[in-house]
Amino acid sequence: MKAHAFLAGLLLATVPAAAQTNCGQLPKIWEGPAYAVSGDTLAGIDLKPPLKLWGIRAPALGNEPGVGAMRARAALEDMLTSAEHKVSCRLVAFDRECRALAQCTVTAEWPAGSKAQPHDLAVRLVEDGFAYGFGLEAPPPWDKDASAKIAHFESISRQARKGLWPHWLGEAPKP
């Protein structure tokens, strides 16, 4: 799995947002109401194009058989709902297909009943087993530990067989 993600990361080279000129302009920071387009993509009012969460991959809707992609999208939507859909995103880069990659957080009570605090959506999706680390070789300059956090929680989630890991490891039928 790691080799697959590494090779895919090489194919999906990223260019820092400041250096990318032919992908259009997005604000460096975007805040507002958002909803889940897929397990790793957000859309918001007055936000074009949608933002992909930096550092992760989730099953793509329409590209994979079974309900894994729907479960990943539902997990992201549940996270957004718990934060009343209020999201804060910082643009990290554009990928070679000019998709905006962003680090996005919500303020929510996780676990339920705890004090509300900021949570990185990508880290939470990986921790819950609905996404895996991808393209971690160039972390955001403001969060040098972002790659390590995602890799750490991916390892824990995989070992615990959370979310979609039994399917990804071939231990269960397609969800």
PLM feature segments, named:
Residues 13-16:
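N-terminal signal peptide c-region/cleavage motif recognized by signal peptidases
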Residues 9-11, 165:
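Enrichment for repetitive, rod-forming helical segments
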Residues 2-9:
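Sec-dependent signal peptide recognition
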Residues 18-175:
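Small beta-barrel nucleic-acid-binding modules, primarily SNase/OB-fold domains
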